[in-house]
Amino acid sequence: MEIKGKRILVTGASRGLGRALVTALVDAGADQVIAGTRKPEDREPLKSEHVTPVQLDVTSDADVEAVARMGAIDILINNAGVAGFGNPLTMSFEALKEEIDVNYLGVVRVTRAVAPGMISKDDGMIVNVATAFAKVNLPIVGTYCATKAALLSLGQALRAYLSKHNVRVITVMPTTIDTDMSRGFDVPKMTKEFVASEILTAIREERHDPPIGDEANGLCEQLAKDPLAVEKTLMNYKA
């Protein structure tokens, strides 16, 4: 799908990959990027001719409904996410619930609000930002991976209902990105700018649930050959 001239909503746009996506979309010629942030102090630095920062906590029905009233969106990028590090047997239920509410239910909430506008004009794209570890769990962030596995499955369901309306749904799957979320996580990391650029390519080429980066591609190739071996290797990465 062409990006130039489009009206695009990015959730979780205040920093990290979200901020990089906003910059990349403007550079690619987007007409308006609606940049969703939770904190008021994060909005002012985002303001520009083609960027409209808005209050958007994806766990808030009121925030989501307010953004939906701003009018139809051409491309929705569900980027907002939180990650809890730890053992699912001992992590607090509050942390688990936050991951589910932001990473999964937040996507459902925003997509439900935005999809009717796409359906009405018989055109649009929904991009869900997951991880290649949605396909095989990385235990140190095991519950985060579980929410992203749910997101990958959700994308398949959304395609079933939206394809007849010419609304494309893709789930992009990077591995670890060098952002605040991965600070202290001693593994190879991709830059947020690289991942943003790859996501824009996936949008333009309408790729089907693409892995992002060499590590993600390699992981998916290994999974196709010997999924049990991959799982056993990743079992060593625990909190």
Regions found by a protein language model. Give the residues of each.
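Conserved glycine-rich cofactor-binding loop
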Residues: 14-15
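Conserved NAD(P)H cofactor-binding loop of Rossmann-fold oxidoreductase domains
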Residues: 80-85
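Substrate-binding pocket helix/loop in short-chain dehydrogenase/reductase
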Residues: 87-97
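Active-site loop immediately N-terminal to the catalytic Tyr-X3-Lys motif
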Residues: 89, 138-142
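A short, exposed helix-loop element centered on a Lys and neighboring polar residues
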Residues: 111-112, 156
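Residue(s) in the substrate-gating loop at a strand-loop-helix junction
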Residues: 131
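C-terminal helical subdomain
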Residues: 171, 179, 183-221
